[in-house]
Amino acid sequence: MKKLTALLLVLAMLVTLAACTKKDEKKEPKDSTAPIETKAPAQLVDAPVLNINEIYGLSPEGQKATLANTLSLTDEDKAAVKEGNYKVAICMHQMDNDVNVMKVNTIKKILGDLGVEIIAVTDGQSSVEQMTTNLETVIAMNPNAIISIAYDVNAMVGIFEKVRDAGIKLVFFECAPTGFVSGQDYYALVSTDYYGSGRFAAEYMAYLLNYEGTVAMVYYDADVWTCNERDDAFRKVMDKYPNIKIVSEQGFADVSQAGTCADAILAQYPDVDGIYATWDVPAEEVMASASAVGRNDLIITTVDLGDNAARVIAEDGMIKAVGAARSYEDGEAIAYATVYSLLDKELTDRYVATPTQGVARENVLDAYANCYQVNPSDMIIEIWEAVYGTWTSPLA
């Protein structure tokens, strides 16, 4: 009977491991476009800076960034775009998260106020095939410009070549297709500094661990530049600290697998101190897995600030910190870059980036308001105020 029980336990663990795309191994950082930090500070006694004002990463082409807040429109620009009767389409890869919804709403508001007609907003539903179909439909509508993302930088080259060859201006956010050259094949690439986001998630975890312990990664196993950048930044930061070891990396191809990957890590390393996840939704799956085995003391850091992550941070749950996209500023920069393209306005550096917003419990309400330009829900505010006292919104 004991032998049978032991055999069943082994089989259960093997099934859990098989669900993840990577086994217990450390993935070597890719050749990131960002500078490599190779030396740990001699002493770190303060928490990492939350209000970050610099860009750490480079574009996929190795370009330095134009800060998004330097883009502006003159009165003459505004008048010209209103007189142009321009039509723009927005082709998204996914619309199931707060970050992308905010981007789209901001773009629509700014362009709409300038008299630009938004003729389509499409949802690719995290599918290259669906995005391709959407783009083909939009090309037939003959817009002046398309705002989109190369959700798969290789598989979507063909469809974006069709957009380019149709004479439609292209403004990308986050990812451009492989081989496309800024200023020639597309006008500009606008992105959050995702290298900076992964860097912050790593630095804050290291700080909470007092720079020693074991960590693991639940990462998105796909060729997506924005995800690869943050994951590689996490690895490189951890490599600086000799007393911190990444003991396991488990990759998922679909968010629904993230919990299974966390299960595998916790089965192999039940005492692991922290787990990083590529963004907040899989981080929630990691949290559920940890809770199921009584690991409520697990430290989780991630990227992106959805409402659930904000609530967990406010109540001092397992998610302790995130490197967040300044979604309103991202949307604003995308809209302005699109106007630049419509007017053939000069843009010296074609990579436009917004700095990461560092988020921890102490500043989660301010950070949320800064990222989205709306206040968090009353529930999140009440949770935070129970500890810190009355909050005054920076938007008031």
Write out the residue ranges for each language-model feature.
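Sec-dependent N-terminal signal peptides of Gram-positive bacterial secreted proteins and lipoproteins
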Residues: 4-22
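A residue-level marker of the well-folded mature domains of exported/periplasmic proteins
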Residues: 20-396
